[in-house]
UniProtKB/Swiss-Prot annotation:
Belongs to the universal ribosomal protein uS12 family. Part of the 30S ribosomal subunit. Contacts proteins S8 and S17. May interact with IF1 in the 30S initiation complex. GO terms for molecular function: rRNA binding; structural constituent of ribosome; tRNA binding. Pfam families: Ribosom_S12_S23. It comes from Picosynechococcus sp. (strain ATCC 27264 / PCC 7002 / PR-6). This is Small ribosomal subunit protein uS12.
């Protein structure tokens, strides 16, 4: 506990909040170009081939982003939109690719939770 004299000499300083998605630079989304599209395996209790892409952003960062949904059309030089949000079982993956925007098409034959995967409403 500081004395009153110590507080007069130098005031208390605010703790800086550490952002969970620094590459977005305080923006909700960022555009980027895929430099590599590949699959990777998750952490210990889980087993799968998760689809991820290495993306060079307009902010100058190069990040690893997860490609959600079943099937995708992304390849090298595809232009994608990135949002924040980590994948718990993939270390170092702190971003998601937004489906249904720019070069990333929506998930085909998706009936429920369509807005998260950029799928249009199916015709009756």
């Amino acid at each position: 506990m500081p004395t009153i004299q110590q507080l007069i000499r130098s005031e208390r300083y605010k703790l800086k909040k550490k952002t969970k998605s620094p590459a977005l630079k305080q923006c909700p989304q960022r555009r980027g170009v895929c430099t590599r599209v590949y699959t990777t395996t998750p952490k210990k209790p889980n087993s799968a081939l998760r689809k991820v892409a290495r993306v060079r952003l307009t902010s100058g960062f190069e990040v690893t982003a997860y490609i959600p949904g079943i099937g995708h059309n992304l390849q090298e030089h595809s232009v994608v939109l990135i949002r924040g949000g980590r994948v718990k079982d993939l270390p170092g993956v702190r971003y998601h690719i937004v489906r249904g925007t720019l070069d990333a098409t929506g998930v085909k034959d998706r009936k429920q939770g369509r807005s998260k995967y950029g799928a249009k409403r199916p015709k009756e």
